[in-house]
Amino acid sequence: MQLERAAFSDPFSFLGPQYQSQTTALRVWLPGATSVKVRLSGHVEYQLLSDPRHSGIFVLNESIDMTEVHYELIIDWSGTEQILDDPYQYHDISPTDAQVHTPKEMYNHLGAHLFNVVRDGKQIQGVRYLVFAPNASSASVIGDFNQWDGRRHIMQRIDNGLWALFIPEHAVGTKYKFELKGPNGESLPHKMDPYGAHNEQYPSFASVVYDQTSYQWNDAKWQQRPVTEKQKEALSFYELHAGSWKRNENGDFLTYRELAEQLIPYILDMGYTHIELMPVSEHPFYGSWGYQPIGLFSPTSRFGTPDDFKYFVDQCHQVGIGVVLDWVPAHFPSDSHGLANFDGTSLFNDPDPRRGWHNDWQSFIYNYDQPHVREFLVSNALYWFEHFHIDGLRVDAVASMLYLDYSRNDGEWIPNWEGGNHNHGAIALLKWMNEEVYSHYPNAMTIAEESTAFPGVSAPTFAGGLGFGFKWNMGWMHDSLNYIREDPIHRKYHHDTITFPLVYAFSENFILSLSHDEVVYGKGSILDKMPGDEWQKTANLRAYMGYMYGQPGKKLNFMGAEIAQSAEWDHDGQLQWFLTQFERHSGMQSLVRDLNKLYTTEPALYQKDCEPAGFEWRLQDEAEMSVLAHERLGDNGERILVVSNFTPAPREDFRLGMPVAGQYELILNSDAHFYGGSDYSVISEASTEKVESQGLAQSIVITLPPLSTVFYRLK
């Protein structure tokens, strides 16, 4: 029997009230029950008869009109009575087409949501379950409520490849999964809800019904702030892994609420404008750092509930800190409870491994050519802005999405219809996602981690671009780190390495990123990349940080760089906070704090981060002394001179030609004693002299401390 195998796609045609010409046949399926009664409209009871042919089926044949009548089942389980509301009396629960195909609506309907149905003039509360599994032959909702028995709550196949069931009395906290059978009736692993708002950890990986409307936000002032042009703002991001920034005294994770209590004051003190969280979407393997997500609609329950995460964002906003999330639409893991082989087919990925499998990451690649995949991912992007008030998404591994031959040899990939290597489906997805985000949330930002020279990543879609607000400048990161790791005596031979990023600095809206990618897999810490002894390492890092903050582009530091952490990042521990008791580490922390303050308060350092008009070389080709000098310009004539000396030799009486006459005052020196520097004597004010230098009619004379970056402001 199909019911016994939970292999039934149309349970409403057999179960619940079956209307005939003169009578109503009520049929229920309760395997294991001893007897069943039905109570109509709260008072009239009838005994159902057991079907002698099929154990577990109980039938009532009476000349009664059950149209719109609410009834309950009184079930005897071998001496234990249970009263249940029969889900098969509720037929009209289908969503509209727009609700399941409009990205901004989908997350409010697909999955498990609190739902009310009117029967007999009263509101019946429960949960409506909707799952997209077009190739499944049957689907059931399973959980503690039915002992995880897929025979008890078989779903109805409706339009659009959806399965639906309304279960009365289900509420927030109900644990559930979907039991699906493949196209040929084959059993599949139990599946987490792809739209689940809350999920349990190993071993159950169960989804949990959640009410996303219950949290009371207090960030109205932040949400209603005027829309601004982000390219003109000072943006300084602190990239963070929630599980390893800091642990409690027992070595356990901080909760989202504890993180709010401890992290937010730190961010305020350090002067960062935004927290960028590595992925918080639910992921089964902690060691993936979130980059192998399964529950895309659920903040990981390792650190608390969805409301706890909302509290974290809320608290950030109340003190003026923005929150950006890493988002992973490039691939998904092969864990059996996730999207892999979801309905017995490659529903979310291309079945051909040359397009659907990523060998490097041992994960599936989304099939962006499929409309339902694009809808799913765009809906997820909007969901985080709508329900969690986030301020931006940093999209991971964009290059792997754009190119069909990404990390593949000849013969390992399939060209597109033009014979080329561009993934047109992925390009369409990214454009659509960006258009939807900026349309609905004009104060938002989207950021691409894109490691190639794909054109127009941060250009608007109407101009042929992908539509991102910003792009990580990974070329700058690699080139500048390659330069700074050279021994100072050899840097003159690599001078072009440090100057080359300025050739393309304004081809995109760039963020200069010192990300987690540079402190993992044996790469050591940022400090460890610096040459020399302990003092020289720290001095090099101070000079490098100063150079970074003086360059055009927004700023991003991964946690730990600001205290000159000596060890490579360890996701199983916490940052080396004990190092801040030592002068060179506390000094570095003070320098980064002051650099953030300088960057966010001096318009010349941020207003034209993305415009060529905001940058002028003063000294580009001084390779022999490894000195670089440039000016940053603001909208109203503000000028700041930034000079870096990347050798341990001080440069006294150093003359620089200046285009504007006047007095230049020292506003930051990375070699100052309170940063742990040598405190080499410097000139605090330099006035231009009518002495030609570097082709300019006037010049100033300054002193450059060893391994330093200095900032001078035109008064």
From Swiss-Prot:
Keyword Glycosyltransferase part of the UniProt annotation: yes
Keywords annotated in UniProt: Carbohydrate metabolism, Glycogen biosynthesis, Glycogen metabolism, Glycosyltransferase, Transferase
Involved pathway(s): Glycan biosynthesis; glycogen biosynthesis
CDD domains tied to this protein: AmyAc_Glg_BE (cd11322), E_set_GBE_prok_N (cd02855)
Active-site residues annotated for this sequence: D396, E449
A GO-annotated cellular component: cytosol
Keyword Glycosyltransferase: yes
Designated name of the protein: 1,4-alpha-glucan branching enzyme GlgB
Taxonomic lineage from the root: Bacteria, Pseudomonadati, Pseudomonadota, Gammaproteobacteria, Vibrionales
